[in-house]
Amino acid sequence: MINIAKEHKVNEQIRVRQIRLIGGEGEQIGIIDTRDAMNMAREKGLDLVMVSPQAVPPVCRLLDYGRFRYEQQQNEKENRKRVRSQEVKAIKFRVKIDDHDFKTKTGHVRRFLDDGHKVKVTIMFRGRERTHPELGERILVRVAEALADVGTPEGMPSMMGMDMNMIMAPKQAPAPKKERTEESAEKAGSAGETEPVPAASAAAEAPANV
């Protein structure tokens, strides 16, 4: 795979007389005049893009530059999203928290989990509250139960100073049963083996009608 830089010379921006050309399917065409390569690009409805300007002669490739840029931007967006998902967000609760505040803060945790973030849930103790860690544990249990559909606790709660902490991680959605069944069928077919599925088993695995 050729790594194309963000800034490239495209079509008429390519001023050299000869280039080494790579076709739209990655095939090596060889060293040809740039003018001939431009004509070839026009005939195929593609762009001539310089992918390796330091080579002698420079290497160019035939491709749909607009589509390539779109795919590159989508990949960059996914990479940024992946980096953001590695951030750990933090939401703090008090030991004495009313139902309204609990619901509001739990909603914040839910949004972070939905966005793919881990969340550190912190219970803050004041004064003598620290002598009753079970109060903080109860709140953390409530949080975990309220968010069981979108997240799971990582490890046990831990005390740090006057705070009790628990990390909630996003829950990965399981692959649909239909896809797993099709994948198994493909593997069995490629191996030249087919095994009968008992009727009871097939009925159990079939998704329920809603």
Swiss-Prot record:
Pfam families with a match to the protein in the record: IF3_C, IF3_N
Keyword field: Cytoplasm, Initiation factor, Protein biosynthesis
GO biological process, one term: ribosome disassembly
CC terms in the record's Gene Ontology section: cytosol; membrane
Span list, region Disordered: 169-210
Cited SUPFAM superfamilies: Translation initiation factor IF3, C-terminal domain, Translation initiation factor IF3, N-terminal domain
Biased composition regions of type Low complexity, renumbered to the chain: 187-210
Subunit structure: Monomer.
Protein's name in the database: Translation initiation factor IF-3
